[in-house]
Amino acid sequence: MLQIKELCVKYDNIQVLHGISLELQEGELVALIGANGAGKTTTLSTISGVKRAFSGQIVYDGTDITKAGTDEIVKMGIVQVPEGRQIFSKMTIEENLILGAYTEKDSQRQKQNMKRVMELFPILRERRRQTAGTLSGGEQQMLAIARALMGNPRMLLLDEPSMGLSPLMTEQVFDAVKSLNDQGTTILLVEQNAYDAMEISHRTYIMENGVITREGKSSELMRDPAIKQAYLGGD
């Protein structure tokens, strides 16, 4: 579904990604983990068209999207949920969700998508007329994901969804991410909370200093002593 081939990206004159390659099959939940500054967010931003690669290729469903614009990429079914949520705090939950449906012109599908996200996040249904800025951090993260779903994407790019959340809220958000994937949405999950990300994902890529250093089935990598020591708090 998505193939990234030898991707190189710079910020000004500083190279951030050094020829990374990764792929997602349709229906997969794939984790991309690594320390701060490893290049994880840059990877998502380049897939979504916010950043530009100076070499390499991004192919989605057989189409080269390396130089495609953000609007074009969204219309193709790839939506990014950025780090920090970036909701409209003075608007209601319902208004935020409606804004997320701007690519969906069919009013009936909009209603179906609204019903779907309200079922996935019941707390949003209960508070749909509440302003988004009054929600807790975890509830705002749920809203950010729900807003992305209003466009009925085939692939979600999730950037640090657990950032700043309590353990309980983190669990609820990850449960929702797993449920979304179970319903068929392909997900690339960038996350510093390596244990939780690997626990719900099919496969994991590990990134260090703009390079993919390891990849494989999440269940197998979680048993690797070196990875347990470096990322999972193991002995």
Q: What does each of the following model-derived ranges do?
A:
Residues 1-235:
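Glycine-rich phosphate-binding loops of nucleotide-dependent enzymes
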